[in-house]
Amino acid sequence: MQTGLSLVCLVLLCSALGEAALRKTKKQAVVTDTGNSAKSDPEPVPIKTKGLKTLDRGWGEEIEWVQTYEEGLAKARENNKPLMVIHHLEDCPYSIALKKAFVADRLAQKLAREDFIMLNLVHPVADENQAPDGHYVPRVIFVDPSLTVRSDLKGRYGNKMYAYDADDIPELVTNMKKAKSYLKTEL
């Protein structure tokens, strides 16, 4: 009897706490406009969320992004599409410039959206194949569906082979096409 009563009390307490939390969340999510005395029933104004982060991180809202390298590898294999990994930093001027150029290029966006599993990372991954010549940013690495890093698809720099500049979008698009076309002949 004692255990049954304790269980009922616990359920009631959890339910009450859940209700209170829900009410508090609703109150915080809406700010009322009290400055206009002409309105009898104030309109709720949603609070603006500053710095809301999404998986695209500004690289293209229309593109479906995966969250982790492991998820990207699994989806690449499952969907028989290459994985394109963009390594960057949020506050790096070169990363920001490349991001703007990538978003502005319609063909790059179309290829990314339709033909690739896409991942952008702001932190290093454990797989050293993702940094064959260093951990610089921005760098773009392609991985085929057999989970092989495509070391043949490089940028134009000899000392940082997988680096791309904002002016290198045509080169990046060319490598995206190569990553896609080799896929059909290799598999």
From Swiss-Prot:
The keyword Secreted applies. Keywords: Secreted, Signal. One of its GO terms (cellular component) is extracellular region. It comes from the Eukaryota. Residues 1-20 form the signal peptide. InterPro entries: AGR/TXD (IPR051099), Thioredoxin-like_sf (IPR036249). It is found in: Secreted. Belongs to the AGR family. Probably involved in cement gland formation. This is Anterior gradient protein 1. It comes from Xenopus tropicalis (Western clawed frog).
